[in-house]
């Protein structure tokens, strides 16, 4: 059986996105040079990985202040709305992972973070002392960690790249975040593979390990598998309920019949038994059919 890492679709990107060697002093000099030349940020910069340099350029274009100390916080009403969605399938799929990691990270000077597709933190677990330190820079529920809000960081850069990524210490764009190391990986919707969240391992720079990005990717993949199982069970129960009400008409009738789950995805189209070779039918199964704002 393949491991989560073997199955992860971006498994070939680990070495590209994880630093082989890291010299914080050299990276700090590269950052200072970059900030001093903000009007010409595309100039080549030595001493920093390309993936980080490109993120600095994006952060600069977004108007992020280099001296920013903390991430902005989402307004309570907006956070409450996001939490309502999180209480459904996403929460069920992540709880085992978060519970297990909470115990593992106790005393390990690290924390695990779950965000939504916009980089808004929904839940944090881990070492209490680290959680308290994180709250000082809004590395806490409600903090907004997209690149456009907080510059180069594990969560925001993983969101932008749609790949697992490591951002260590001086590689962060904002001064207030340079004491931290973050390894993050995107969580994908099992139906359409869009990003629905980020799982992120964070701590002060002493937790730096090259394999942390791969570890985050494995956690993300485990959550995706749990989401897929939950979605399959939900779709099966819906199909079972519909067939149970009028089994003969559902399976053998000539009328058009489509079954759409509560996320607006087509899970059954009776026309497929007559025109199974039609790509428009097979391609539609499991894909968004209605324009719903929710996603799984």
Where are these regions (language model features)?
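Intrinsically disordered, low-complexity terminal regulatory regions
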Residues: 1-148, 156-166, 179, 188, ...
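PAS/PAS-like sensory domain cap-loop motif
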Residues: 130, 134, 268, 272-285
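Terminal output helix/cap of sensory domains in signal transduction proteins
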Residues: 155-156, 277-296
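PAS-family sensory/regulatory modules and their coupling/dimerization elements
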Residues: 171, 180-185, 287-296
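Hydrophobic transmembrane signal anchors and adjacent membrane-proximal interface regions, especially
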Residues: 237-244, 275, 290, 296
């Amino acid at each position: 059986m393949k491991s989560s890492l073997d199955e992860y679709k971006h498994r070939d990107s680990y070495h590209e996105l994880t630093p082989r060697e890291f010299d914080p002093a050299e990276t700090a000099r590269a950052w200072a040079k970059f900030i001093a030349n903000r009007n010409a940020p595309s100039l080549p910069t030595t001493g920093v990985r390309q993936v980080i340099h490109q993120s600095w350029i994006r952060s600069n274009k977004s108007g992020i202040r280099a001296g920013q100390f903390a991430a902005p916080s989402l307004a309570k009403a907006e956070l409450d709305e996001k939490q309502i969605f999180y209480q459904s399938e996403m929460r069920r799929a992540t709880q085992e992972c978060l519970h297990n990691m909470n115990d593992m990270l106790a005393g390990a000077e690290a924390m695990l973070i779950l965000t939504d597709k916009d980089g808004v933190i929904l839940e944090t677990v881990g070492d209490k002392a680290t959680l308290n330190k994180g709250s000082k820079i809004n590395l806490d529920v409600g903090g907004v960690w997209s690149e456009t809000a907080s510059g180069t960081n594990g969560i925001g850069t993983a969101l932008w790249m749609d790949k697992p990524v490591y951002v260590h210490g001086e590689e962060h764009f904002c001064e207030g975040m340079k004491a931290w190391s973050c390894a993050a990986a995107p969580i994908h919707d099992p139906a359409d593979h869009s990003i629905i969240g980020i799982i992120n391992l964070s701590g002060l720079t002493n937790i730096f390990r090259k394999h942390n990005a791969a570890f985050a990717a494995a956690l993300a993949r485990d959550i995706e598998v749990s989401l897929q199982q939950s979605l399959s069970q939900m779709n099966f129960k819906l199909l079972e309920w519909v067939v149970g009400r009028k089994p003969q008409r559902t399976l053998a009738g000539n009328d058009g019949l489509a079954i759409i789950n509560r996320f607006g995805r087509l899970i059954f189209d009776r026309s497929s038994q007559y025109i199974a070779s039609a790509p428009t039918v097979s391609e539609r199964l499991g894909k968004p059919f209605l324009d719903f704002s929710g996603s799984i």
